[in-house]
C-alpha cells in the first residue's frame, strides 16, 4: 500500500505582507501546497478595505462569512499588527528569524521606512528570501509609478493585442496581469528557496507586473521579425473563433491543425472550405458562412456533433457553469468550502496536482492566530493583548 504523500511545501514558512491581488495569489498557491503562510494584516489597511467594500456596515456574523469567501486568504494564518507601531515591528523582526520567505507588495522604499527592508531583515536571517511585487520593479525610471492590472497591460504592449476591434485596444474581463504576476512570483520564490537551502544565502526577488505581463507577447515575438509584421488582432482566422448559435448561446472552436480543420468542415457540411484554410482573401466569406450555419441550430446540437466527430471545441461557460463542470469537480479544481455559519461555497482548488494537498480551510478573521503565533515567540499574555489591539 502506497503511503500518503505529505503536502509538497510542508515546512516552508512564509510571512506575507501583501495586500493586492498578485501577492495574495502568490501566497495562496504556496499555502494550498502546504506552506505555513502567516498573513500580516494592518488594522489601518483593513479599515480602508472595509470602507471601500461596505464590510464596515456588516454585523460580525456577516463579516465572518464574507471573510470566509476570500479564497486568496484560504489556508493562511492571520496576524493582526499595526506596522507603524515600534513594538509590532520588533515582534515582526523576531518572527523573520524563523521564516524562510517574506512577501510584500508595497511601493519601493515604504517598508524600508519601517525598518522592514530586505537589507534590514536579511541581516537578521541571511537565508531569507524576500519577494517584492510592484508595478515596474525596484529599479528603473518608473520604479515609483503606481498602478493596477490595466496599467501593466497597457505599458507591456499586451493591451494593444487584446480585444476583437482592430482599431482600439481592449480590456480583458479578468485581471490577467495580476494573476500572471502572482504565478511568476510563486515560481521565483521556490527557485530562490532552493538556492537558499543549497547555499545558506537568501536573495531579494524583484517581480514587476509589467514584465510578467510582457510574457503574454512571447508567441507574437517568436513568430514575426518585428511586432509590426503581426496581423491585426480580432477574428482574422477562419479555423478558430467564437460562434453564436440559434439559442443565443456561444461556443468556441480551435481547429487549426489541418486534420481537425478538415473534420470541422465536413461536420459543417462545407468540405469545399478545406483547401481554403489559410486563404486570407476568403476568410471573411468563410466566417460569415459559418456564422450563418451556427445560427440555424441551438448550441447543444453543435456540441453533440463536434463531440462525435472529435474536433476541438468548447461551450463558452459563464463562471457558474464552469464551477459546475464535472471535469473540474472530478479533479478537485473546484472544491466546496464550509464558511462560518455552515454555508457551503464552491471555490477554486489548487490549479496544479502534486498530491498531498491539505484540505481547504476557509480564511480566518483578522487576528485569529495572534495568540498562537505570538506565544510561539515567547510573549506574555499582556504583551499579546496590547499588540493585538
Named regions from a protein language model:
Residues 1-201, 225, 365, 370-389:
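N-terminal helix-loop segment corresponding to the beta1-alpha1 unit
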